[in-house]
Amino acid sequence: MERADIAIIGTGPAGVSAAITAKVRGKTVLLFGSRELSSKLTKAHKIQNYPGLPDIDGAQLAQAFKKHLDVLEIPITEKQVTAVYAMGGYFGIQTPDAMLEASSVILAGGVVMGKPFPNEDELLG
């Protein structure tokens, strides 16, 4: 079984940024999450706090993230991670049909929002 340098669980801004940084620094990467990236990101009407990209909307930023992943040839594995095991010098990453290995794991699952107001979940971004 081939061992990746870093497994990243989550394809929101933090997970994508970690994957890009790792790849640029010559590390092998396993990126787990949705190919559609973060639904919170894609629903955002306007993002004003992302460095270098003032007034971009979430869908545009998600497309820029996808393009950057494509250029660096970082695939997204949509298999659900069901468990992570510390194995001493490495980690075992369990999916429904495979056990993968990585020297390091980054959990970038985002945040769980509180109970939304009526219809808020459709408007969040």
Question: Model-derived features: where do they sit?
Answer:
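Glycine-rich FAD pyrophosphate-binding loop
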Residues: 7, 24-43
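Flexible, glycine-rich phosphate/dinucleotide-binding loops
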Residues: 15, 38, 56, 114-115
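Short Gly/charged-rich anion-binding patches and loops
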Residues: 17, 36, 64
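N-terminal Rossmann-like dinucleotide/flavin-binding domain of flavoprotein oxidoreductases
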Residues: 42-99
